[in-house]
Amino acid sequence: MSDQTTPQFRNLLLEEQLCFALCRANRAITRTFGRRLEPMGLNHSQYLVMLALWEENGLSASRLAARVNLDPSSLTPILKRLEAMNLVRRVRPKDNQRTVLVRLTAAGRDLQPCTADIQRAVADATGLSGEDLAQLRAVLHKLADTLQKDEDRQTDVA
């Protein structure tokens, strides 16, 4: 038995790492979405922004960044690209010029029905049942929420 397979080192194997499994799954699902989004001119990050706006149009840029789990500085180039594609527009309310609201254009709203087939195709590509996908999503959200709470506690202590 090599050192790497002894019980004390088993948890150090790459294939045993949760972070590695999550990274592989993230890359695979992003590529799978990407292939299907490419004909629409969207990448995965842009698609997530569009999903958030289809749910709630007119979000502030800061709220939108939080909603899609991006830093505001990472959201800006995505919004510029979506604006260049005439899918969104950024506006400043007259009563608060410091705030930037992101609104869908007619073209942005019209794009939503085209994405239903993409969702189905990606779900089918996973090979998981609807129930398995729902359970996986729930576990991943629970994991993210728990780790975020832990990070918040660590930040409060520091």
Residue ranges and their predicted role:
Residues 30, 80-138, 145-148:
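Charged, amphipathic alpha-helical coiled-coil/dimerization segments
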Residues 23-26, 51-55, 116:
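Short, locally clustered residues in the helix-turn-helix/winged-helix DNA-binding domain
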Residues 61-62, 73, 80, 100:
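Residues within helix-turn-helix
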Residues 65:
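The alpha-helix within a helix-turn-helix
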Residues 56-60:
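Short capping segments at the starts of secondary-structure elements
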